[in-house]
């Protein structure tokens, strides 16, 4: 496959034409009486018309046939997608999942949509407030099928296997250690090349943004130039009665048939697009004096709530970096948090837990549920002689953090068959080191 080209920049006002049809963008207006090449003009709105310019999201698509050219939608029963946060009783315990099992292609072919499983979530889709965390487990490409989400934005984190994603805006190749965001309403189809697994953070009613940098300054963390947007590409392909458009609407899946490929956009312009980002480009900020900094310094993207400084969801990574803090317990500290913390692992291991937390698995530490380094990590980090050291080389852990109290689904607790019933035992060996007659502990040699 030829190397794909992209446009650079987060949230930019962009325009793109398929080079096979030069001049396909109208000049000086959005919807002329007759578009170049006799295309249809269609606007895709990601915000209310009256939002301030700084938050107004929309794109104009110039396509061979408009999206409305389909037969009626009908409800389908496919995958394990849900928005029912009350199907099992709440569980405040620390939860950890072993790597989620990918179905074997020799037993059953499963594509991205049929391999979607909702793990946990909170909020209300109908009021555009909340989120869901999904796991996708698939072994075959989507053939003459596409998907779009009426409920929210998908932040997709592939863990195993490359994703070739066809969108109405063009094509993206997304590999492990990259992420992509497919925003609300955008149609896409995914080709896979092997048994494939990954994580999805879905947010309702808001879009992902770059976090404010404050005293960090003008540069740092995820820089806007490193986000890549696909360039226009179209196919004029007839599929008589055989192309299926799948829609997630109010948490349910629906399907409609049409006679053509939906990827028939010859040109587009706007600021409402899909995009991808390579996590290796994250510019890490860290403590260079003492103490363990809060993990918010590792925020890649945030979906803000109406409360200043409080997110519906943050996407946070724990990338390779230097650890140099003096007189400091360097691993993550013990913590009880008003936020919910879901963690996943793309590759390698996580610094606070060397065993049990594996690539393709996950953990959930719910609101105010205590968590922190396991006993082995505490003993080693408390006694090691401190020197500058590399941390997390060859690894990439991440966190979906939310101000919402997340409910785990029946699939997450039971049907996945991946819940680690012994997770709590990693803290059982912790013991008291209290020395009431000696304030100053001995320094490590």
Swiss-Prot record:
It is linked to Alkaptonuria: An autosomal recessive error of metabolism characterized by an increase in the level of homogentisic acid. The clinical manifestations are urine that turns dark on standing and alkalinization, black ochronotic pigmentation of cartilage and collagenous tissues, and spine arthritis. Highest expression in the prostate, small intestine, colon, kidney and liver. Gene3D superfamilies: Jelly Rolls. InterPro entries: HgmA_C, HgmA_N, Homogentis_dOase, RmlC-like_jellyroll, RmlC_Cupin_sf. It comes from Homo sapiens. Pathway: Amino-acid degradation; L-phenylalanine degradation; acetoacetate and fumarate from L-phenylalanine: step 4/6. This is Homogentisate 1,2-dioxygenase. Keywords: Acetylation, Dioxygenase, Disease variant, Iron, Metal-binding, Oxidoreductase, Phenylalanine catabolism, Tyrosine catabolism. It comes from the Eukaryota. NCBIfam families: hmgA. Its cofactor is Fe cation. The modification N6-succinyllysine is found at residue 414. Fe cation binds at residues 335, 341, 371. Its EC number is 1.13.11.5. The modification N6-acetyllysine is found at residue 98. It catalyses: homogentisate + O2 = 4-maleylacetoacetate + H(+). Belongs to the homogentisate dioxygenase family.
